[in-house]
Swiss-Prot record:
Annotated catalysed reactions: a 5'-end NAD(+)-phospho-ribonucleoside in mRNA + H2O = a 5'-end phospho-adenosine-phospho-ribonucleoside in mRNA + beta-nicotinamide D-ribonucleotide + 2 H(+); NAD(+) + H2O = beta-nicotinamide D-ribonucleotide + AMP + 2 H(+); NADH + H2O = reduced beta-nicotinamide D-ribonucleotide + AMP + 2 H(+)
Motif (Nudix box) on chain: 159-180
Organism of derivation: Klebsiella pneumoniae subsp. pneumoniae (strain ATCC 700721 / MGH 78578)
Annotated EC: 3.6.1.-, 3.6.1.22
Protein name from the UniProt record: NAD-capped RNA hydrolase NudC
HAMAP family in alphabetical order: Nudix_NudC
Cofactor binding note from Swiss-Prot or TrEMBL: Divalent metal cations. Mg(2+) or Mn(2+).
Positions annotated to bind Zn(2+): C98, C101, C116, C119
């Protein structure tokens, strides 16, 4: 899976270091390896996009290293592969030594895994399951400003799934903890890999059941009901949060217009 890049190799290049992405000119590099001074570097083939290979290279380019969020407006498939590259680069960087015996590890040749020759332990990339839910009450949707979003963006509620918890239980718990309300009629919508740093978002829609909004100030700045045709600043297109909000708006329009 890992090999040395040759002069004629071409495709999309995910050059990553410490969860950063090389973005010369603000774009994901695409083309022949020689044009990006990548010949001779180690590369991992991580997929294909539009008939061309996508490669992950672990390297700090010092200049033009940016965030994956800068390519959020790319096609979802390419964004997903870039996220895969960043997560794999960080996985290999953080698993140089075995967590059980402390001996050096090496990469598997057959799968994305790190192996310990001493104690035979095998490690895989970590994925953190999360829930994200759009809650509707008649013609309004519950939107909140999170403490980590200081840019005025209002979004739906979300949180990590705890050990020994189902996705449905996680929705009920997170909604109650963050807003103080209960929901019903929970429906699965879609999922989205979200490499910030290693989440898998599972998206739901739900209806308001009962309760008054009581904001958890550790998590949220504000939370309120917003009529579907009078919404505040929303998450950018391409995010599953935006998809949930737009789907809820479409349902409200169909019912109230």
């Amino acid at each position: 899976m890992d090999r040395i890049i040759e002069k004629l190799d071409r495709g999309w290049w995910v050059v990553s270091h410490e969860q950063k992405l090389w973005l010369p000119g603000g774009e994901l590099p695409h083309g022949e390896a020689v044009n990006f001074d990548l010949v001779g570097q180690h590369a991992l083939h991580i997929g294909e996009w539009q008939g061309e290979s996508v490669w992950m290279v672990r390297q700090d380019r010092r200049h033009d290293m940016g965030s994956l969020r800068q390519v959020l407006d790319q096609d979802p498939g390419l964004f997903q592969l870039a996220g895969r590259g960043i997560q794999l680069a960080e996985f290999y960087r953080s698993h140089k030594f075995c967590g059980y015996c402390g001996h050096p590890m090496h990469a598997s040749k057959s799968e994305w895994a790190m192996l310990c020759s001493h104690c035979r332990e095998r490690y895989y990339p970590q994925i953190a399951p999360c829930i994200i839910v759009a809650i509707r009450r008649d013609d309004a949707i519950l939107l909140a400003q999170h403490t980590r979003h200081r840019n005025g963006v209002h979004t739906v509620l979300a949180g990590f799934v705890e050990v020994g918890e189902t996705l449905e239980q996680a929705v009920a718990r997170e909604v109650m903890e963050e807003s103080g309300i209960r929901v019903k009629n929970l429906r699965y919508v879609t999922s989205q890999p979200w490499p910030f740093p290693q989440s898998l978002m599972t998206a739901f829609m739900a209806d308001y059941a009962d309760g008054e909004i009581v904001v958890d100030k550790k998590e949220l700045l504000t939370a309120d009901w917003y009529r579907y045709d009078d919404l505040p600043l929303l998450p950018p297109p391409g995010t599953v949060a935006r998809r949930l909000i737009e789907d809820t708006v479409a349902m409200c329009r169909a019912e109230f217009e």
